Design a protein with these regions (language model features):
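N-terminal basic, low-complexity leaders that serve as flexible interaction/assembly modules and, when applicable
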Residues: 1-45, 49, 89, 93-95, ...
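Short glycine/proline- and acidic residue-enriched helix-loop micro-motifs
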Residues: 3-4, 63-72, 128-135
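Generic, ordered loop/turn and secondary-structure boundary motif
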Residues: 5-9, 48-50, 58, 66-69, ...
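Noncatalytic linker/hinge segments flanking ATPase motor cores
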Residues: 17-27, 69-80, 141-145
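A short acidic, glycine/proline-enriched capping/turn motif at secondary-structure boundaries
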Residues: 36-39, 54, 107-109
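Short, flexible, mixed-charge acidic loops at enzyme active sites
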Residues: 45-57, 113-124
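A gly/proline- and charged-residue-enriched helix-loop-helix capping module
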Residues: 52-90
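Active-site loop segments of alpha/beta catalytic cores
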Residues: 76-181
């Protein structure tokens, strides 16, 4: 759905989608309806979802990304935090003593999407690993904004944050200490 990001940015719909399973089943927690690619979106990279293909990201503008400040980033994805607050303060979560789970993509996995501009299972760019300077520069930006994103999720009611590192398996063992942390 090309409007998936818009759905994630609709605090009313995303909180309702999050709460639906708790209304039907006796689950331990509410997992926020969102996507790990909200972070690249917050960094002003175009993010769309194509039916039958998956995520497609626009060209990365490293200069724009490095100049982005915390206020602009948080403002762009603020509806995600409002949805977390809505879920964590909902009667079903509070009255049934349920936890609220937020999540992020790990730096490496986000880097793969940002540079590759799509899922690596579709195609991994041939020169992906050749620009260490670019990789390390983006990782530093991701570290900064992941901390902000995690803190905002917790400040708005997430009890725990799950970190997804979906593409760690692309690395050779010797590279793990450099990129998985």
């Amino acid at each position: 759905n090309p409007n998936f990001i818009n759905l994630c940015l609709n605090e009313n719909l995303s909180s309702e989608i999050t709460l639906q399973p708790l209304k039907r089943f006796d689950l331990d927690a509410a997992i926020i309806f969102s996507d790990i690619l909200m972070l690249p979106y917050g960094l002003n990279q175009k993010v769309e979802f194509e039916k039958g293909f998956g995520p497609k990201l626009g060209e990365v503008n490293i200069e724009e990304m490095s100049k982005l400040d915390e206020i602009d980033f948080v403002q762009k994805i603020h509806p995600v935090y409002k949805a977390i607050k809505k879920v964590s303060s909902s009667n079903i979560v509070k009255n049934k003593n349920k936890n609220t789970i937020g999540f992020v993509g790990a730096p490496w996995t986000l880097l793969v999407y940002i540079i590759n501009q799509q899922s690596p299972k579709k195609n991994l760019k041939e020169n992906f690993f050749k620009n260490d300077f670019l990789i390390n520069r983006i990782l530093l930006i991701l570290e900064k904004f992941l901390k902000i994103h995690i803190k905002n999720q917790i400040d708005n009611g997430a009890d725990v944050i799950q970190i997804f590192d979906s593409w760690a398996g692309l690395l050779e063992e010797k590279d793990l200490p450099n990129y998985i942390y």
